[in-house]
Protein backbone atom coordinates (compact mmCIF):
# COMPACT_ATOMS: atom_id res chain seq x y z
CA UNK A 1 0.00 0.00 0.00
CA UNK A 2 1.27 3.47 -0.86
CA UNK A 3 0.03 6.72 0.68
CA UNK A 4 0.96 10.26 -0.34
CA UNK A 5 1.63 12.69 2.51
CA UNK A 6 1.26 16.37 1.59
CA UNK A 7 3.39 18.82 3.55
CA UNK A 8 3.47 22.64 3.62
CA UNK A 9 6.83 24.33 3.11
CA UNK A 10 7.58 24.71 6.82
CA UNK A 11 7.38 20.92 7.30
CA UNK A 12 8.74 20.00 3.87
CA UNK A 13 12.14 21.35 4.92
CA UNK A 14 12.28 18.48 7.44
CA UNK A 15 11.61 16.02 4.61
CA UNK A 16 14.46 17.17 2.41
CA UNK A 17 12.31 19.81 0.74
CA UNK A 18 9.70 17.34 -0.52
CA UNK A 19 6.13 18.62 -0.30
CA UNK A 20 4.82 15.23 -1.51
CA UNK A 21 6.22 12.24 0.39
CA UNK A 22 5.20 8.70 -0.50
CA UNK A 23 5.19 6.15 2.31
CA UNK A 24 4.41 2.45 2.45
CA UNK A 25 2.89 1.89 5.90
CA UNK A 26 2.94 -1.52 7.57
CA UNK A 27 -0.79 -1.23 8.34
CA UNK A 28 -3.93 0.60 7.28
CA UNK A 29 -4.36 3.34 9.90
CA UNK A 30 -3.18 6.92 10.17
CA UNK A 31 -0.90 5.84 13.02
CA UNK A 32 0.79 3.37 10.65
CA UNK A 33 1.21 6.11 8.03
CA UNK A 34 2.79 8.47 10.58
CA UNK A 35 5.07 5.65 11.80
CA UNK A 36 6.29 5.12 8.22
CA UNK A 37 6.74 8.87 7.72
CA UNK A 38 8.74 9.16 10.95
CA UNK A 39 10.86 6.19 9.92
CA UNK A 40 11.83 8.04 6.72
CA UNK A 41 12.12 11.50 8.33
CA UNK A 42 12.63 11.34 12.14
CA UNK A 43 12.74 15.12 12.67
CA UNK A 44 9.46 15.52 10.82
CA UNK A 45 7.82 12.86 12.98
CA UNK A 46 8.74 14.76 16.14
CA UNK A 47 7.09 17.93 14.79
CA UNK A 48 3.84 16.08 14.08
CA UNK A 49 3.51 13.89 17.20
CA UNK A 50 4.27 14.52 20.85
CA UNK A 51 6.26 12.34 23.26
CA UNK A 52 3.18 10.15 23.87
CA UNK A 53 2.77 9.48 20.15
CA UNK A 54 -0.39 11.57 19.75
CA UNK A 55 -0.80 14.19 17.04
CA UNK A 56 0.24 17.53 18.52
CA UNK A 57 -2.61 19.90 19.38
CA UNK A 58 -1.40 22.55 16.96
CA UNK A 59 -1.16 20.13 14.02
CA UNK A 60 -4.17 19.33 11.85
CA UNK A 61 -4.18 16.10 9.85
CA UNK A 62 -6.62 15.24 7.07
CA UNK A 63 -7.13 11.90 5.33
CA UNK A 64 -8.64 12.44 1.89
CA UNK A 65 -9.88 15.84 3.07
CA UNK A 66 -11.48 14.64 6.33
CA UNK A 67 -10.19 15.96 9.67
CA UNK A 68 -8.95 12.96 11.66
CA UNK A 69 -9.87 14.56 14.97
CA UNK A 70 -13.49 13.74 14.10
CA UNK A 71 -12.83 10.37 12.41
CA UNK A 72 -10.90 8.22 14.86
CA UNK A 73 -7.60 10.04 15.33
CA UNK A 74 -4.63 7.74 14.85
CA UNK A 75 -7.02 4.80 14.29
CA UNK A 76 -8.52 6.52 11.22
CA UNK A 77 -8.51 4.02 8.33
CA UNK A 78 -6.30 4.93 5.37
CA UNK A 79 -6.82 3.33 1.96
CA UNK A 80 -4.24 2.52 -0.69
CA UNK A 81 -3.57 5.69 -2.71
CA UNK A 82 -4.96 8.02 -0.02
CA UNK A 83 -3.74 11.56 0.50
CA UNK A 84 -2.80 12.58 4.02
CA UNK A 85 -2.35 16.31 4.50
CA UNK A 86 -0.46 17.65 7.53
CA UNK A 87 -0.99 21.32 8.42
CA UNK A 88 0.55 23.00 11.46
CA UNK A 89 -1.41 25.87 12.96
CA UNK A 90 0.00 29.33 12.37
CA UNK A 91 -0.23 32.00 15.05
CA UNK A 92 0.78 35.58 15.06
CA UNK A 93 -0.34 38.98 15.98
Regions from the PLM with identified roles:
Residues 1-92:
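Ubiquitin-like/PB1-type beta-grasp interaction modules and other compact soluble beta-rich domains
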Amino acid sequence: MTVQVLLPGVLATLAGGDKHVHVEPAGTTLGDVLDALESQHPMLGRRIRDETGQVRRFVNVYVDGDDVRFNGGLATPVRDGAEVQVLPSVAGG
